[in-house]
């Protein structure tokens, strides 16, 4: 899992992504990354076992899958209405925008200056849970399904 928001333009497929529809952006970058890794590793590499997932904006976007639990997970339940207001502006949490000013983490930090991204994001993810993220985020759900289909 990598986020496209901070990904250098030199990553495979990254410069082509903005020309795609939102639904195709991540898939384009994922295909190009997989092809690049496969080319670099050669014939002994099994590309079916490399399953990239590109979060188009930031990890925090996924946490908006359940605004109430996101707020509780960072010990700020009073922020739930504001998180819900952010969430309802977008078709899916994966689409919460990526401007340097309004990126998902910046939205959280604007409401809660003490937000500590690595620690609190992890705690919130536990509260939000995979079921909510999979239900609300088609790209994440698809990635999880591809991982589940891998044979061990």
Regions found by a protein language model. Name each.
Residues 3-152:
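C-terminal accessory helical subdomains adjacent to catalytic cores in phosphodiester-
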């Amino acid at each position: 899992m990598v986020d496209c928001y901070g990904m250098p333009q030199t990553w495979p497929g990254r410069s082509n992504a903005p020309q795609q529809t939102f639904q195709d952006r991540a898939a384009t970058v994922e295909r190009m990354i997989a092809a690049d890794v496969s080319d670099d590793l050669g014939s002994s590499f099994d590309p079916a076992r490399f399953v990239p997932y590109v979060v188009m904006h930031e990890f925090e976007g996924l946490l908006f899958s359940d605004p109430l639990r996101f707020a509780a997970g960072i010990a700020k339940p009073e922020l739930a209405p504001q998180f819900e207001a952010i969430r309802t502006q977008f078709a899916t949490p994966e689409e919460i925008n990526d401007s340097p000013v309004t990126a998902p983490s910046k939205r959280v930090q604007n409401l809660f200056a003490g937000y500590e991204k690595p620690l609190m994001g992890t705690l919130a993810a536990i509260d939000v849970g995979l079921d909510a993220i999979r239900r609300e985020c088609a790209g994440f759900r698809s990635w999880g399904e591809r991982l589940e289909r891998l044979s061990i």
